Amino acid sequence: NALLKSGQPELIYSKALEYYQKEKWSRASTLFEGVQHYYSGTPREDSISFFNARCKYKNRDYDTAATLLDDFRRKFGRSAFIEDAEGMYALCFYYLSPGPSRDQTMTGQALIAINEFMSRYPHSEQIENFKTINTELTQRLHDKAYLNAYTYYKIGRYKSAIVSLKNALKQYPESSHREEIMYLIVDASYRFASNSVAEKQTDRYLAMLDSYLSFKEEFPESKHIKEVDRMAQHARDYLDRNKQEDNNI
């Protein structure tokens, strides 16, 4: 780029701003990066750093933008751009966060950054948008925990399913999947007991009945009630028969 080779920082900066205002993000970023070292330690340093990071953000290069914005907020904590920078930093992780079927590490990072922003800037114009995003990302974590547990259930690994489902409830007690998770715990416990060797069935049916009573108490009007009632009756019948056999010995 001839302009960058000109050695005229004011001209380069002026052209970078022109591209920036015209939303030509790639061209603006190239010039901001090329002129940055000229203004190191000057009052213009934070502006150039912010504009360049925003160019990356607008170009949807969220990985690079997040790195630049993190550097910016650490270095220029008192800048006039700090609120915007921290908002964009949080949003980078939001846009990098994948759907619930994939690893949710980025979602966790997004939630941390978003909650930090809301705590720091409770009166921000962006606060309502961030609240909405916070709800969406939290739901994504609930979905992930549910899907992980359901996968074990679906492939017939009922012991693992029970553990995973209980962990999902423990981790996210307010989950929108709570009813379905508690139902699956009952169902998986019933199947696990039914498929167990005789000497372990009694304890496992008793554990299943505990899960059943918890489910019925919390969701007495559930669409699954008839089904879990049937399972519970089968478990009780087994326990009664077993008790009679023990008494006859």
Positions of predicted regions on the chain:
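Acidic, polar-rich low-complexity tracts and alpha-helical solenoid repeat scaffolds
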Residues: N1-I249
